[in-house]
């Protein structure tokens, strides 16, 4: 689903993307040829819907599409867990927060929910098969608040693997290579996200391109030098 054309300094429309009847949402993310945008909302709204909103930090109009994963298995249950990163001062990192699924549930995907723009999700990825890790950096001039919402799934016989793939060294003002990460045979892709010690980057691509593969591309808008970004992907099998 498209967020449409977004003017400089403006927010997109808040866009809800619903799964087909009988399916539960498992993850999602942006697909764009543009850099310099912040995904203010990129998270589950409820068990069947993903919500997206982007802010254009750049000097020209941009377009951002959203792609989400929906899964269906007889007896599949879902819970959406919300945890706040708290108040984040200007040019400061939030605390690193771990969000654990309830007992018996596996992590599927997650992302930020905020009324603020100009922040980087340095960590927004699975830590292990039951926990999501989040850390945000505030690129703006005043304090902000960011919540993170994750999807947890449960059904008898559900298995998970976490796949890690590096985007390599990304030079200042440059894009990383477009990088595809595929799940092992028999597994389906769910959510994904970055694991980085660096701030000030945009994930132009962080979305599924098929039922088993996620595509990632980062743009480094940090003027002080190269950065490294790793992507971590949840793969599920029943």
Label every model-predicted segment.
Residues 1-238:
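Extracellular attachment/recognition segments
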């Amino acid at each position: 689903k498209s967020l449409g054309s977004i003017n400089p300094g403006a927010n997109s429309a808040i866009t809800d993307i619903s799964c087909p009847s009988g399916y539960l949402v498992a993850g999602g993310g942006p697909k764009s040829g543009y850099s310099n945008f912040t995904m203010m909302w990129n998270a589950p709204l409820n068990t069947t819907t993903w919500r997206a909103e982007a802010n254009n930090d750049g000097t020209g109009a941009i377009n951002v599409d959203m792609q989400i994963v929906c899964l269906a298995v007889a007896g599949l249950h879902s819970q959406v867990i919300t945890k706040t990163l708290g108040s984040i001062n200007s040019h400061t990192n939030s605390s690193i927060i771990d969000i654990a699924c309830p007992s018996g549930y596996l992590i599927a995907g997650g992302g930020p929910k905020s009324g603020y723009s100009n922040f980087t999700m340095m960590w927004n990825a699975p830590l292990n098969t039951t926990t999501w890790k989040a850390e945000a950096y505030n690129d703006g001039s005043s304090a902000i608040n960011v919540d993170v919402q994750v999807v947890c799934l449960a059904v008898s016989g559900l298995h998970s693997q976490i796949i890690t793939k590096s985007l390599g060294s990304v030079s200042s003002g440059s894009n990383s290579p477009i990088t595809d990460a595929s799940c092992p045979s028999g597994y389906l892709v769910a959510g994904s996200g970055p694991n980085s010690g660096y701030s000030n980057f945009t994930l132009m691509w962080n979305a599924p391109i098929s039922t088993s593969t996620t595509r990632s591309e980062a743009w480094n808008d940090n003027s002080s030098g190269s950065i490294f970004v790793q992507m971590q992907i949840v793969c599920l099998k029943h």
